[in-house]
């Protein structure tokens, strides 16, 4: 009983911290910064998107750095593709209605200008150490760009960055999504429990899956930024292209449902109770909060993670790297999140879950299981808790 109470207390604390961090003040701050930077850069995400996509695949010949611009981009994308645009989109749609997808795309549009600025500053204020390693990111451009009197803010950012990296979106969210997917595939009824901790049962599928992921991550991370970039350059394009192809199969396979899905998304973005019904409890405020918040979570625009990787890019051109960094938001949210959202809405996967049992990875899995023409080969029978 004490263990269950402790687990509930931990969940309550995490929930309160989450609501505080992803509340309106932070969302408005990051979104307002994106709007301001969009105006200041003259809508760089519109005027130079084509050039940015070209620079993304064409590395600079005589740049200074440790990894290619494409490698730095893939390193940043490896932290966002799979978590925010698969799990996050599904959760946003279930909690905020299909209209959350539209607000997510709006956040991504302005977030592209923020990402451009982050990449620009990463190169402008990076430092080359004696061992030829390049270091940069928010800690450096806060201190060097704003002045030494703001060094305390750079240190504070580093402390919070470590906390988020260890206990937030850096590790826990990813491994939870992977573990849930592995368990639902190999042991959907949780019949083989390895141990119980804080009131939660952990199956052997979860334990073994976690150990495999830990080993793979260790082998990559211990090789430094160069090995991380090399592995990311192979894995990220492969998983992104594969995911896009399968998502397109689902969406195009339900092509007749697309107009109704788009209409539902637009209607529920501005009048969710009229589109979904008053009983759902979804309001325009909730749709905006979940959509914009999950959008920022998905592409990490303004969170300061991408410029750390961008600082190691082989380039002398600040504008060029800013444009390359900007494409991360375009790929992550504008392309992949849109396809994820459409695949969920056209298949109606979000309707199989109630707010109290929302688990994003299961919702997206259901869309794939029921939406793919060969779903019989991929489908695993859901447990009763999956269909509540």
Language-model features and meaning:
Residues 43-69, 91-93, 97-101, 113-148, ...:
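Flexible loop linkers connecting adjacent transmembrane helices
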Residues 2-83, 93-100, 111:
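N-terminal alpha-helical transmembrane segments of multi-pass membrane transport
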Residues 110-118, 210-225, 236-256, 289, ...:
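Selective recognition of specific alpha-helical transmembrane segments in multi-pass small-molecule
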Residues 63-95, 121-145, 156-159, 163, ...:
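Alpha-helical membrane segments and immediately flanking helix-loop junctions
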Residues 22-27, 59-68, 98-99, 147-155, ...:
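Membrane-interfacial loop-to-helix junctions in multi-pass transporters
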Residues 379-388:
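Single conserved hydrophobic/aromatic residue that forms the stacking wall/gate
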Residues 29-36, 40-53, 175-182, 204-266:
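Membrane-interface loop-to-helix entry segments
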Residues 38, 118-126, 130, 246-264, ...:
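Extracellular/periplasmic helix-exit of transmembrane alpha-helices
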